[in-house]
């Protein structure tokens, strides 16, 4: 069944507009509670319980209350963790033996957006089929459990501390971060009170920015999607490197001491090449957006590479299908299944630092064999219901570009899973040609939209 509300990363939208309204989110909580508990087959007498975490958006208070009401009506107890990174919810759901976890966040989006995403009892994002089942229940009348079976809610005070220790446990015992000065940008998001403690407790000198959330400033000129802020912090403070997370803490971008920015492909290469050298890497999963240079660099090391659809959920699915442990996206979602069940910005940063420490290398030295092809990405806004695949002009322009590039590049057109955008990506060895072809395709899309 096709999903109406769920995108590549849960249900997301502008606050106050469907589906991110209090009424809809309450119905979503009820539908999810009924669906997820029914799939768990609890022993008789055991009460179902679900964890709710959120980022620092002001709308999180409203949506948390709405979700809580929906779960309570379904007879589900709720544990409220407060502001906490998305991967922390995945970990705590599993560690506390709960039936599911829920995150209220729109990740890297502005404060006026928000979203809801779910984790299974095992700490993994829900399969498409389960999300479709939840959607089907949303369309049915909302019920209410008997009074004696209504859900209860309580706050858990040690969520942050538990997660800090979990993150630190992913870093090798024989290593520490003493002598390292790290600039850390938490995007005024969910990791603001957690990430600085992780790196400090491992011995680093931490220069923190983006750690003063006010409900409105999440991702505003800071974080993994705005790495220039981190770059300036690294250069002005003479840091050895910089680490940027996004609003919900599952995305990672880094900066070296010279101010060069390292995206997800480069950081994944650092982790993968270190593990390949240790003989503990079977293969790497990237996405359709992963740079060809990244794929070729892995091939030179004899490392198998496969491309999943864009979205960390699809990277995770392919990792499980192939029995591999490492994968990610150039956007900074990196998954290390030998450390966590989902992508985690803090843990991914620790894996990069461990690789550099073990090999006694800097970021630039670890990436010296990695030569990226120029890649141009242009986002074109699409009106609701516009069928770009059926437009002959768009198809012809894209086909012409592919013929021009031949075996030296790629063309990719794909709709965003979270916004009304068509992403036009062109990649090749000649930067000027790549730019020209990308602009040509984007122009064809704009003309088609204009009619």
Curated annotation (Swiss-Prot):
Top-level taxonomic group: Bacteria
Taxonomic source organism: Azoarcus sp. (strain BH72)
Taxonomic path: Bacteria, Pseudomonadati, Pseudomonadota, Betaproteobacteria, Rhodocyclales
Transmembrane segment boundaries: none
NCBIfam families, A to Z: glmM, PRK10887.1
Annotated Mg(2+) binding sites: 107, 246, 248, 250
Protein's UniProt name: Phosphoglucosamine mutase
Keyword set, alphabetical order: Isomerase, Magnesium, Metal-binding, Phosphoprotein
Enzymatic reactions: alpha-D-glucosamine 1-phosphate = D-glucosamine 6-phosphate
Pfam families: PGM_PMM_I, PGM_PMM_II, PGM_PMM_III, PGM_PMM_IV
Cofactor mode of binding and number, as noted: Binds 1 Mg(2+) ion per subunit.
Modified residue annotations for Phosphoserine: 107
């Amino acid at each position: 069944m096709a999903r109406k509300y769920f995108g590549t990363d849960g249900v997301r939208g502008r606050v106050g507009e469907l589906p991110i309204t209090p009424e809809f989110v309450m119905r979503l909580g009820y539908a999810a509670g009924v669906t997820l508990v029914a799939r768990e087959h609890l022993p008789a007498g055991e009460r179902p319980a679900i964890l709710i975490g959120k980022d620092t958006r002001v709308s999180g208070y409203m949506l948390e209350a709405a979700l809580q009401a929906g779960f309570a009506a379904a007879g589900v107890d709720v544990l409220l963790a407060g502001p906490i990174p998305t991967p922390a919810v995945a970990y705590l759901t599993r560690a506390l033996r709960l039936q599911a976890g829920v995150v209220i966040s729109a990740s890297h989006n502005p404060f006026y957006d928000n979203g809801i995403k779910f984790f299974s009892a095992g700490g993994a994002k829900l399969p498409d089929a389960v999300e479709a089942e939840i959607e089907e229940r949303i369309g049915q009348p909302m019920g209410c459990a008997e009074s004696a079976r209504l859900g209860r809610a309580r706050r858990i005070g040690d969520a942050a501390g538990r997660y800090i220790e979990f993150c630190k446990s992913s870093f090798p015992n024989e290593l520490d971060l003493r002598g390292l000065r790290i600039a850390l940008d938490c995007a005024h998001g969910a990791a603001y009170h957690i990430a600085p403690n992780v790196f400090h407790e491992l011995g680093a000198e931490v220069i923190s920015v983006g750690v003063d959330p006010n409900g409105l400033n999440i991702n505003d000129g800071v974080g993994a999607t705005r790495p220039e802020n981190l770059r300036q912090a690294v250069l002005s403070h003479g840091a050895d490197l910089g680490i940027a997370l996004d609003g919900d803490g599952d995305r990672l971008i880094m900066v070296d001491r010279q101010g060069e920015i390292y995206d997800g492909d480069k950081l994944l290469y650092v982790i993968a090449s270190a593990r390949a050298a240790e003989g503990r890497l079977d293969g790497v999963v990237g996405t359709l957006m992963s740079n060809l240079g990244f794929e070729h660099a892995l091939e030179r090391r004899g490392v198998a590479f496969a491309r999943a659809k864009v979205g960390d959920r699809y990277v995770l699915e392919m990792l499980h299908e192939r029995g591999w442990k490492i994968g990610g996206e150039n956007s900074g979602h990196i998954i290390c299944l030998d450390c966590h069940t989902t992508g985690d910005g803090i843990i991914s940063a620790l894996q990069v630092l461990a690789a550099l420490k073990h090999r006694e290398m800097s970021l630039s030295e670890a990436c010296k064999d990695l030569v990226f092809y120029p890649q141009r990405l242009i986002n074109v806004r699409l009106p609701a219901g516009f069928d770009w695949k059926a437009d002959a002009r768009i198809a012809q322009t894209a086909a012409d570009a592919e013929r021009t590039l031949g075996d030296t590049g790629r063309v990719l057109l794909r709709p965003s899973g979270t916004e009304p955008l068509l992403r036009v990506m062109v990649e090749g060895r000649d930067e000027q040609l790549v730019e020209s072809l990308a602009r040509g395709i984007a122009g064809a899309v704009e003309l088609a939209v204009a009619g």
